[in-house]
Amino acid sequence: MGRALIVVDVQNDFCEGGSLAVAGGAAVASAISAHVRGGGYDHVVATRDYHVDPGGHFSESPDYVDSWPVHCVAGTAGASFHPELDVTGVEAVFSKGAYEAAYSGFEGAAGDGASLVDWLRERGVERVDVVGIATDHCVRATALDAAAAGFATRVLLGLTAGVARPTVDSALEQLRAAGVELDGEPAVG
């Protein structure tokens, strides 16, 4: 039974100093790197927000529900992985949100066009651990889609950072209801 780690959106714009920063993001990047060095995974993949022109997803007066400040624009430093995240062991990167809003890594594609679900299945993965930023948005969406696709899914909350307590609590309820295993406590801004 293959096991994979999905590292969600550990990008400069989602860490301290970024345009849509989540408190604790840089520490999460470093902790994920240490976790990966500890081994135990058959595969490690990463997702990233990689916007070209996502339409109404960007706004100068965002509502922080459907619209957001400009972030993770393709080719910019903000879209790059945080320097504390060691990506040398990452086998594939799944980019999402080029021309529309996208929260789940399962909405993205690798450079060769492969979807995350197909990539994992082709390698015999049956169990996934999900980590990254933000617990209450893209980590939640990715874990829910992993479970819906039939993967035994666990979120390592100690390797996530969330935006706000109310939305993190709501996300955790949704994840529990979907049968996602939750391990630890997230950092919450």
Ranges and model annotations:
Residues M1-G97, E126, A148, A152-V155, ...:
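Active-site acidic carboxylates
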Residues H35, H137-A148:
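Histidine-anchored nucleotide/phosphate-binding helix
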Residues L120-G124:
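Immediate post-signal peptide segment of exported/extracytoplasmic ligand-binding proteins
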Residues H71, F106, G132, A161-G162:
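A generic secondary-structure micro-motif detector
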Residues V125-C138, V155-T160:
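Glycine-rich anion-binding loop/nest that anchors nucleotide
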Residues V87-W119:
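Histidine/lysine/aspartate-rich catalytic loop segments that bind and position anionic ligands
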Residues D53-G56, A102-Y103, V139:
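Short catalytic/ligand-binding loop motif for oxyanion handling, primarily in non-cytosolic enzymes
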Residues A29, G113-V117, R140:
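Short, well-ordered alpha-helical scaffold segments within catalytic/effector domains
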